[in-house]
C-alpha cells in the first residue's frame, strides 16, 4: 500500500484542487470496510429448498437472509397486513381497520405493532434493514391523488358525520387537518416504536423519498428526469419523517419502456439526487444512509436488465454515494425450477459480475482515497463518472468445483487509475473522521455517535 500512496502523492501536482463542496459526514457502513452493499429482498426460498437451485448470492457479494427468504436478519419488509392495524383500502377494494387513520385507534395499532415486531424480528440485536411498505395512502393530503383520492373523500365524509353543523368549506379544511394529523401520528409513532425495540436496525418507509418524475411516458425526448419543484417542496414539509428515520428507501425501478435509454439514467439520477438531498437535511450530525430499491428485471416483466441499465441502476446508485441497493423481486422468481434457473443464470452472468465490479471498486476507492474512513462520492453529481474496476488493470475470475464457487478479483491500481479517482470523486467521511481524505480522527465527532 505504501508505494501506491507515494505514487498518489506525486500525482497531486497534476490535479485540480478540491472543488470546495462540503459533504456531510456519513454514518459508518453496516459492515466494516463495505462502503456499498447489495441486498437481496426477493422471496426465492423455494429455489433453494424445493428446487435445489442455489442462486449463488453470497458468491457475488450479495447480502441476503437465511435461505434467501424475503425477511430475516439482513432485511425485513413489513407489508400492510404485517405490522399493526394499518387503516387502508387494498387493491381489490377491501376495507381494513377503519380505512382512514383518524378512524382507527393509534394505541391499538402500536400494541399490535409491538407484538408483530417481536414475532417477525425476535432478535433484539437486529442490525439489518427494517422497511415499512405502506403505499396505500400518503401522509400529505395534496399527494393523495388518483386512486388515493378515496382517502380524501372518506375523510371529508368522516368530518361531515361528526360535525354536520359546519359549512362545506370548514368541513373540508377540518378533514384535511385531522387526516394529516392522524397520518403523521401513525407513521411517526410506528417508526419510533420500531427504533426503540430494535435500535440497531436501519428503519424507514419504502418509497420515501419519492420525487414523482414519472412523466417519461409523455415527454419522450423532452424528458429531463428532474423532480418537480412542488414535489421537492412537499418533501421539505416531511422533515418530521426524515428526522425520525434512520435510513431512506427510494426506488429506482425501471419499466421496459426505459430500456437502455437516456431517459432511464435521467429517471434514476434525479430520484437519487433528491434522496441524497433529503438525507443531508434530516439530521445535523450525519447524512442518513440511502438504500435504493431496484429490480434485477424490468418492472412487471421477467426480462433481465441490460448491461447498460445495470450501470444506470447499480452503478449510478454507488457513484451518487448511496450506502447500498436492494434488489426486490416477486414470487415469479421462484415459481418453477425454470424460473429459478433463469435467475441463477443471470446472477452467474452479467448481474453477479457487475455487482462484484461495483462493490469491489467502491472498496478500493474508499481505501486509496478515503483511508477506509469514508466512501467515495462523485465530485460533481451530474457527471458520468462511475466506480468501476479499470478493465486494463483488473480481472474478475470465477472459480467453481463440486463443493464451492468463489469470485476472485485480480489486479492492482495504476497511477492513471488513481488520478481518475482523485479527479472525479471525493470522500464522504464516516462519523469520527474528517479532512479531505478522512485522515483526521475527531474525538468531538465520535462523541456525537
Curated annotation (Swiss-Prot):
Keywords: Disulfide bond, EGF-like domain, Glycoprotein, Glycosidase, Hydrolase, Secreted, Signal. GO terms for molecular function: hyalurononglucosaminidase activity. It catalyses: Random hydrolysis of (1->4)-linkages between N-acetyl-beta-D-glucosamine and D-glucuronate residues in hyaluronate. This is Hyaluronidase-3. Glycans are attached at residues 67, 103, 111, 153, 357, 401. It is found in: Secreted. One of its GO terms (biological process) is hyaluronan catabolic process. It is an enzyme of class 3 (hydrolase). It comes from the Eukaryota. Expressed by the venom gland. Snake venom endo-hyaluronidase that degrades hyaluronan to smaller oligosaccharide fragments. In venom, it is not toxic by itself, but increases the diffusion of other venom proteins by degrading the extracellular matrix. In addition, it displays antiedematogenic activity. The lineage of its organism: Eukaryota, Metazoa, Chordata, Craniata, Vertebrata. Residues 1-23 form the signal peptide. Monomer. Disulfide bonds join 47-340, 211-227, 365-376, 370-427, 429-438. Belongs to the glycosyl hydrolase 56 family. Its EC number is 3.2.1.35. The active site is at residue 135. GO terms for cellular component: cytoplasmic vesicle; extracellular region. Residues 427-438 form the EGF-like domain.
